[in-house]
Regions:
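Cytosolic-facing regulatory segments adjacent to core modules
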Residues: 1-69, 83, 179
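Generic hydrophobic alpha-helical scaffold/packing signal
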Residues: 2, 14, 18, 62-66, ...
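Generic beta-strand/beta-sheet core signal
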Residues: 4-6, 51-53, 75-76, 115-116, ...
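Flexible loop/turn segments at secondary-structure boundaries
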Residues: 9-13, 58, 80-84, 120-123, ...
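Helical mechanochemical/support elements of P-loop NTPase systems and associated helical scaffolds
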Residues: 9-13, 33-36, 57-61, 74, ...
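Short, glycine/charged-enriched secondary-structure capping and boundary segments
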Residues: 16-19, 65, 87-90, 126-130, ...
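Phosphate-binding/switch loop-helix module in NTP-utilizing enzymes
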Residues: 48-107
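Phosphate-binding/switch region of NTP-binding enzymes
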Residues: 96-179
Length: 179
């Protein structure tokens, strides 16, 4: 698994992944750090690469996939990856970025998971569908096999940890709706 982190620091993402894998709080991880280091080296390290990818181009992702043959690549945020070419509008550039990501997946027989922001229309919404993808008309949605929106109820002002998962597009088996 490769995680291209161009939104948050790669070290922060790595810590979250490790913490989720071990199902421990930050405090518990600190208390058990010496035991966890060996487990990390055996259970996670050989299978996870996290790249700090600010300024990375989609062409670099393509080259990496050709050389390293990963099974899964997360591109967080795919919208921020650079791409060659001249585009009249931002949505045209985004569509080409998503087309290229899809082609990378097909050529390299790997899953490419694109992470994208939702537009302001999704703010404080429970049901977030593909029409709410940021800065895209239909380009992003057209290239995706599955689109998962993560929403919430209630105001952003309150401490609300409940999230709602919405499958708004699913070419894999056709099912869509709330989980």
């Amino acid at each position: 698994v490769v995680y291209w982190a161009n939104e948050e620091k790669a070290t922060k993402i790595k810590l979250r992944i490790i913490q989720s894998y071990f199902a421990l709080t930050t405090k518990e991880m600190l208390e058990q750090r010496f035991e966890l280091i060996e487990r990390y080296r055996k259970e996670i390290g050989p299978y996870l690469t996290i790249m700090d990818s600010v300024g990375t181009s989609i062409e670099e992702v393509d080259e990496y996939a050709k050389l390293n043959k990963p099974d899964i690549m997360f591109c967080d945020q795919l919208d921020k990856f650079r791409i060659k070419g001249e585009y009249n509008r931002g949505d045209e550039r985004l569509k080409e970025t998503y087309v290229t990501a899809r082609e990378i997946a097909k050529r390299n027989s790997c899953l490419v998971w694109a992470v994208s922001q939702a537009s302001y229309d999704a703010h404080d919404r429970q049901f977030i569908d593909y029409a709410m993808l940021d800065n895209s008309k239909t380009g992003k949605a057209g290239e995706a096999d599955i689109i998962i929106g993560i929403g919430k109820t209630g105001s952003s002002e309150v401490d609300n940890i409940v999230r709602h998962i919405c499958i708004s597009k699913n070419k894999i088996n056709g099912w869509h709706g709330m989980i």
